[in-house]
UniProtKB/Swiss-Prot annotation:
Segments for region (Disordered): 526-547
Official protein name in the record: Chaperonin GroEL
Disulfide bond sites: none
Gene transcribed to yield this protein: groEL
Protein's UniProt keywords contain RNA-binding: no
Subcellular localization, as worded in the UniProt entry: Cytoplasm
Organism: Vesicomyosocius okutanii subsp. Calyptogena okutanii (strain HA)
Catalysed reaction, written as an equation: ATP + H2O + a folded polypeptide = ADP + phosphate + an unfolded polypeptide
Compositional bias of kind Gly residues: 537-547
Enzyme Commission number(s) from the entry: 5.6.1.7
Functional description taken from the UniProt entry: Together with its co-chaperonin GroES, plays an essential role in assisting protein folding. The GroEL-GroES system forms a nano-cage that allows encapsulation of the non-native substrate proteins and provides a physical environment optimized to promote and accelerate protein folding.
GO molecular function, one term: isomerase activity
Keywords tagged on the record: ATP-binding, Chaperone, Cytoplasm, Isomerase, Nucleotide-binding
């Protein structure tokens, strides 16, 4: 085991804070409508230009081991916020920096770190509840477009195309983002279904760029039981080989000899095939398999209805225009099922929704309905150059996640105003002791940081703007684009409640851990060991002289 370098107390916290500041200072310049770009050097190809906070954070690894630990913990804040809300990574980073900076100062002044953490946690809990109380539902097309526009750095065309996509496939419909071939953004809507099961083996992947298995006009075989013996699949594989088409197998499970043989055949190019587990469990799995069967024009091979894999014919196999299988999701685009059958199934599910008394069952039925009737919308991003294309695609991805979050939990005034308003909800909050009260005050000051940073990036005077906004009520705030004050909702400056909530919760969580850190341990870098042993000739001569 290599030797360790250990730092304690203030020295450890200050080194960690240096790392936090290095990462946060690079990320926070991107915040707001007048945020700046960051250029990322790539080991291959040209540099990437981005205003996406999580993209900047992920590129940063610091030389100093202790500083890097601090930077990596803040990177975790950005990544977790991105995973849950899909946006708000820069806001989360700014909040984390403010909390850690003030927290480390307070610990240095003699405060108890555990009590500071408890104070921050109490304030965060109350602030999150206040955000939900302040939140307004986001259901109409105009509000959805506004959320998308703000998230895409005030690009109105992005907000409009996302709102249009949601209108066409429904708010629960599947929307994907691709690189287009023209200069303008385009929207394609195709009937389709997505479910949360991916490929059973990474060896089915045939698109290395997206790490997906893309099948064009494949046959679809559905089975409601486990497949372990390859002999069961031979009739279906022979049909597929004769037609030179691909095959997607969806079954309860595929393992052992059957999976191994499919992988080998696929890698050798004998049969283009992919295998996926059937989504859901029990009776719900059977219902979803039947949905897929109706969508693709196939038949579920089930012993319950007297069908077995050994007797499969081409009539039992369905097809679709395209099927994309990722690590965790499968999208079936333009299934070959009859429209009358699909409409009948949709009406059947609607009838079940009306009669069910269970909220859980109703939610699952609504999911199935959206997948059957909603279809898939594809936003094709257009730009003049490849660098601009990548940046624009990041914007559209962020905006799409933000609009989904807005539909899910509602919206609050944007531009950092919502967090400033929640500070008032903390006015009557007190901790169990003085140090916890300091923790609550730290959280209050940190909640001002996003608004301050937005104003600073726009070249304004942060303290003046903050005081003016704090004196206002409800949705009153500052529009950094026009440098005017007014009702943020009327000006179309909205943030999804889920994004603001996730940013605050993750920033508070990681910051609490960093403030309470008392020791840091890392490996001491090893010098290169010499390849040859040193010459011992001199010692031999010395020995000879002493005889």
């Amino acid at each position: 085991m290599s030797a360790k370098d250990i730092k304690f107390g203030p020295e450890a916290r200050n080194l960690m804070l240096d790392g936090v500041n290095m990462l946060a200072n690079a990320v926070k310049v991107t915040l707001g409508p007048k945020g700046r770009n960051v250029v990322l050097d790539k080991s291959f190809g040209g540099p990437t230009i981005t205003k996406d906070g999580v993209s900047v954070a992920q590129e940063i690894t610091l030389e100093g081991k202790f500083e890097n630990m601090g930077a990596q913990m803040v990177k975790e804040v950005a990544s977790k916020t991105n995973d849950i809300a899909g946006d708000g990574t820069t806001t989360a980073t700014v909040l984390a920096q403010a909390l850690v900076t003030e927290g480390v100062k307070s610990v240095a002044a003699g405060m108890n770190p555990m009590d500071l953490k408890r104070g921050i946690d109490k304030a965060t809990e109350v602030a999150v509840n206040a955000l939900h109380d302040f939140s307004q539902p986001c259901n109409d097309t105009k509000a959805i477009a506004q959320v998308g526009t703000i998230s895409a750095n005030s690009d109105v065309s992005v907000g409009d195309i996302i709102a249009d996509a949601m209108e066409k496939v429904g708010q629960a419909g599947v929307i994907t983002v691709e690189e287009g071939s023209g200069f303008e953004n385009e929207l394609d809507v195709v009937e389709g279904m997505q479910f949360d099961r991916g490929y059973l083996s990474p060896y089915f992947v045939n698109n290395q760029d997206t790490m997906t298995a893309d099948l064009e006009s494949p046959f679809v075989l559905l089975h409601d039981a486990k497949i372990s013996n390859i002999r069961d699949l031979l009739p279906a594989l022979e049909i597929v080989q004769k037609s030179s088409k691909a095959l997607l197998i969806i079954a309860e499970d595929i393992d052992g000899e059957a999976l191994a043989t499919l992988v080998v055949n696929n890698m050798r190019g004998i049969v283009k095939v992919a295998a996926v587990k059937a989504p859901g469990f029990g009776d719900r799995r059977k219902a979803i398999l039947e949905d897929i069967a109706i969508l693709t024009g196939s038949v579920v091979i089930s012993e319950e209805v007297g069908l077995s894999l050994e007797k499969v014919t081409e009539e039992h196999l369905g097809t679709a225009k395209r099927i994309e299988i990722g690590k965790e999701n499968t999208v079936i685009v333009d299934g070959a099922g009859k429209k009358s059958n699909i409409d009948g199934r949709v009406n059947q599910i609607k009838a079940q929704i009306e009669t069910t008394t269970s909220d859980y069952d109703k939610e699952k039925l609504l999911e199935r309905l959206a997948k059957l009737s909603g279809g898939v919308a594809v936003i094709k991003v257009g730009a003049a150059t490849e660098v601009a294309m990548k940046e624009k695609k990041d914007h559209v991805d962020d905006a799409l996640h933000a609009t989904r979050a807005a539909v899910e939990e509602g919206v609050v005034p944007g531009g950092g105003v919502a967090l400033v308003r929640t500070i008032k909800a903390l006015d009557g909050l007190t901790g169990d002791n003085h140090d916890q009260n300091i923790g609550i005050d730290i959280a209050k000051r940190a909640m001002e940081a996003p608004l301050r940073q937005i104003v600073t990036n726009g070249g304004g005077e942060a303290s003046v703007v903050l005081n003016n906004v704090a004196d206002g009520k409800d949705n009153y705030g500052y529009n950094a684009t026009t440098e005017e004050y007014g009702d943020m909702l009327k000006m179309g400056i909205l943030d999804p409640t889920k994004v603001v909530r996730a940013a605050l919760q993750h920033a508070a969580s990681i910051s609490g851990l960093m403030i309470t850190t008392e020791a840091m341990i890392t490996d001491i870098p090893q010098d290169a060991t010499p390849t040859a042993s040193p010459d011992m000739g001199g010692m031999g001569g010395m020995g000879g002289g002493m005889m």
